[in-house]
Amino acid sequence: MGTRPCAGVASAVAAAVAVLLLAVSCFAAAATTTQKHGRMSGKGGDVLEDDPTGKLKVFVYEMPRKYNLNLLAKDSRCLQHMFAAEIFMHQFLLSSPVRTLDPEEADWFYTPAYTTCDLTPQGFPLPFRAPRIMRSAVRYVAATWPYWNRTDGADHFFLAPHDFGACFHYQEERAIERGILPVLRRATLVQTFGQRHHPCLQPGSITVPPYADPRKMEAHRISPATPRSIFVYFRGLFYDMGNDPEGGYYARGARASVWENFKDNPLFDISTEHPATYYEDMQRAIFCLCPLGWAPWSPRLVEAVVFGCIPVIIADDIVLPFADAIPWGEISVFVAEEDVPRLDTILASVPLDEVIRKQRLLASPAMKQAVLFHQPARPGDAFHQILNGLARKLPHPKGVFLEPGEKGIDWDQGLENDLKPW
């Protein structure tokens, strides 16, 4: 897992951190009198803000209730977990000005199927039910309207907020074994999972943030003048004792490495305990660790942005949400998984002016809006970022429409269990 730094290095790191904590606290106090609420000025660091209204039209299929509303009525926990964006996206589109009731003028077609709303008693989506729900929904759409069959879904988009997107499994090995459902291979997938060169991320997908309850976070706001007295903060698992007790497979060993190297380091406030003051603590921290787990993404990234805690992203090859609109390189610190043993030195070496710039950018309301699914929606929020991503794909290329006689979907392709009726 690496070696602990020698006493001289540790002392130098501690001294650098002490100076950083003092300077950042002074900046926080000064910022409360100068912060303006609006878009950041300057050439760098802005969130790309576009109004999608008038740039695209979306037709929302009216599906039988068994695909959405009945599932939600059976288990309202679906509205609270980190996969809830697929439900709120449906609600948003129903009243959005981009919605059209005339499918002939639509640029995009949306199928509201709540694949993450069939839950275990513990509140997790059932991985064997989700692909069956999706396949059944696509079959219904193809049999009821002519639009799917014109393109094999190439002008359709689907939300797939599962751990590994449209591979529909929380374990990577099983997700790769399934692969992206064959019926979705031509569709645009809007998903939380994003990792370069991975079979569960197909070209053209739109990577989005997971759902984190905006109202809950707002209820835990503290004064922005509060000193950031915590250098590094993290709460969560380091080992998945049930599935990977040694820690070598879970998070590719990165979380275990954080714990083994820094559990006794006073600069690191890290624990498996999740206190009632979790959100308040993030607002007192300079850096918040955002390591991969079973998948590279988690709601911590959203929480860190909202609370102005510089995200420390430890997830090699991650594709971040709305990367064409949010300047992640300017608001985050990226640490390679193999460099975790040097995490203290790396973070202590970030120049003070860079830390302050990242904090100033994170303080922008536009930055926070872009990662949140508000109810009701707000300009520039995650819903609008999705629409902007879809609008930027227009017009569709000529090859989107199937030629007469061109072979369409093989409805019998896929894993045997996935082909069972739902």
Swiss-Prot record:
GO molecular function list: glycosyltransferase activity
Main subcellular localisation: Golgi
Cystine crosslinks: none
EC category: transferase
Tree of life domain: Eukaryota
Positions of transmembrane segments: 9-29
GO annotation terms (biological process): cell wall organization; glucuronoxylan biosynthetic process; plant-type secondary cell wall biogenesis; protein glycosylation
Purpose of the protein: Involved in the synthesis of glucuronoxylan hemicellulose in secondary cell walls.
Entry similarity comment: Belongs to the glycosyltransferase 47 family.
Stated name of the protein: Probable glucuronosyltransferase Os01g0926400
Organism: Oryza sativa subsp. japonica
